[in-house]
Amino acid sequence: MNNNTTAPTYTLRGLQLIGWRDMQHALDYLFADGQLKQGTLVAINAEKMLTIEDNAEVRELINAAEFKYADGISVVRSVRKKYPQAQVSRVAGADLWEELMARAGKEGTQVFLVGGKPEVLAQTEAKLRNQWNVNIVGSQDGYFKPEQRQALFERIHASGAQIVTVAMGAPKQEIFMRDCRLVHPDALYMGVGGTYDVFTGHVKRAPKIWQTLGLEWLYRLLSQPSRIKRQLRLLRYLRWHYTGNL
């Protein structure tokens, strides 16, 4: 078996993470032996680690997800500190989603998109079809009522979707994916937050050099000073990291 089809796991504060070496490893793992894995993908960064710590419901939700991976550079550094031999790298959720969509287009994998504003969702669909010929079997923007959820789950099931990506923000998207899987279990689910906005150019992502240096958080802070309260909250995570309380 190709070594890329398996991956070690690492534990941070009780949360088990998949250790992917790079993007290619992630893709080979998810498409092991030509068979797309089923389950839920959840990106983990320092902010989400704090939420998990403080919110028992969110912790239960995320613990139940099969594929938790290091999306934030702080989490990667913590894994490397706790496990010095770990060959783990950051796999950004936005990049992983694009690579999954490109692979889906190549292989004809059926995709259902959920979330986002109606116009952003429409632009996302059009770009996915034009760029990678993605087989989109259905979509639903994020503006639906709670009483419409069950009908949406049934629609997703009837579509036969093999990949369902949900852009609703945490923890709403994790709750949605958990509940939808009760109706349509045989698919790979991925929570993607604001990825559709980035993909369609409505939100600018940090330049590559900032990403490479692990400073995407600083770029976002400089672009959106209102994030300062969220960033200050991360000092608690840094304390865990530097005191070895991982």
From Swiss-Prot:
InterPro entries: UDP-ManNAcA_Trfase_WecG (IPR023085), WecG_TagA_CpsF (IPR004629). GO terms for molecular function: lipopolysaccharide N-acetylmannosaminouronosyltransferase activity. The keyword Transcription does not apply. Transmembrane segments: none annotated. It catalyses: UDP-N-acetyl-alpha-D-mannosaminouronate + N-acetyl-alpha-D-glucosaminyl-di-trans,octa-cis-undecaprenyl diphosphate = beta-D-ManNAcA-(1->4)-alpha-D-GlcNAc-di-trans,octa-cis-undecaprenyl diphosphate + UDP + H(+). Keywords: Glycosyltransferase, Transferase. Pfam families: Glyco_tran_WecG. Pathway: Bacterial outer membrane biogenesis; enterobacterial common antigen biosynthesis. Its EC number is 2.4.1.180. GO terms for biological process: enterobacterial common antigen biosynthetic process. Catalyzes the synthesis of Und-PP-GlcNAc-ManNAcA (Lipid II), the second lipid-linked intermediate involved in enterobacterial common antigen (ECA) synthesis. Belongs to the glycosyltransferase 26 family. This is UDP-N-acetyl-D-mannosaminuronic acid transferase. It comes from Escherichia coli O1:K1 / APEC.
